[in-house]
Amino acid sequence: MNHQETMTDYLTAFIEGLKNSGVEQAVISPGSRSTPLALLLHRETAIQTFVDVDERSAAFFALGLSKASQKPVVLLCTSGTAAANYYPAICEANISHVPLVVLTTDRPHELRQVGAPQAMEQLQMYQNHVKLFVEMALPEATEEMLNYAYWQGAKGAAFAQQTPAAPVHLNFPLREPLLPDLERKTKSSQQTALFAGQSIL
């Protein structure tokens, strides 16, 4: 299995977890590093996607969607300072008990703190304004890692909704090439069946 197939399977399993925990909408501020997640979210027909190139306005738009629907809404952006523009809306979501699922993409570990472009410290960047932070593992397509990816998606959305609702943050280090295989038939339904009926929290 090549890198493109591995990344596609791993991220698809994660998105399946989001979907099965109630995510129906996602607001995407596109950028290079977020390409695979953005395209795979858009491919998922059960999730309605919106595009807003301005991260600050995207975050407040997602906040409004989540308030209106009372359901978790995904926010996705690229690496670097893009994620900092989410900060005001995340603070408001935390105070207002709104279940945002914030997905930031990041340079892989070997490109951090070495002067690579669009790289900054993204770990715990929203501090105590989110109720859960997860630094996702690099994509692998073993059965164990596909289960892990699915579980993190399901857990993230479930945590966001758990009373009192609040935003959660998952950070994805991703290596190039960043284009997923959109024609690939994945087996994420295996994770759905495996975790069916299990308590997420």
Question: Where are these predicted regions, by residue range?
Answer:
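Short beta-strand segments
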Residues: 76-78, 99-106, 127, 137, ...
